[in-house]
Amino acid sequence: MHGCVKARFIVEEGLDDDLRVGLFAEPRSYEAWLRFSNASAELQPDAKADLRGAALKLMGVPGAKLLDGEEHCTTHDFLLVSHSTFLAKDVKEFAGLGMAIAAGNPAAFFLQNPRIALRYLTSIGKHGSPLQPSYFSMAAYLFRDRVAKYQLRPTAPEAAPIPSAPSFDFLRESLKARLASGSFSFDFLVQLRESPPPRDVEDTTRAWSDEPFRKVARVEILQQDFDTPDQQVFGENLSFNPWRCLPEHRPLGGINRARRQVYRALSAFRHDRNAAPRVEPKSWSDRG
């Protein structure tokens, strides 16, 4: 994890009627946590090419949520990565990749599945800061009577060169230095489709190229010092699940259906291993 930072999720005023759905129905500001990480299951230097993850947890969101047993929680999660499409096109490929990673032998899986290996190689990259790339939902979500994908895009991109001799966790250091000097913002956008063919929902390796992304909110990361032992533990113990959401934004497709239980099991395993209770924060001041 590069850092878990304090942010505000600010729904835009004056949205077009077709965008005023669920979470975006009214202009409003939510306290949020934004956790940046590498996607690799193995601990590796930040200078190595990888997918980067951005997990966003909004707090104080009213309304019933879809995740079993957490219907009354007041959080809403978004999970995004630094590539627009996923490595696996269906649950079978997703399960095979997951088992290979859990067994510590993804290389053998890639050798047996060259198409997935090619997708992996085209999706990873090197970045000078977690604030540099755009992040995507990859999978599709309901948007009332339409289907949406999400994007988190820097409002004003900044140059972030990779150091000539980067430290093991230089992305954390870069994020710390940047947020010590001031705030930073991302635009939160949706890409909408009406009645897409099932394959464009089920196959997460397919990009939607024709529909524009439209801004619905802004994510304002506050100026702060997040690099403390307590915040590191807090961030590592946060749980994210795409099904912790309002019904208007229901996750769609086989990959999302699989993530519902896979992510819950991974969260339970991590919290048991760390002897940490799993709680959903209600505000910035709520540390569980």
Q: Model-flagged regions — what are they?
A:
Residues M1-G288:
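Active-site-adjacent core segments of small-molecule enzymes
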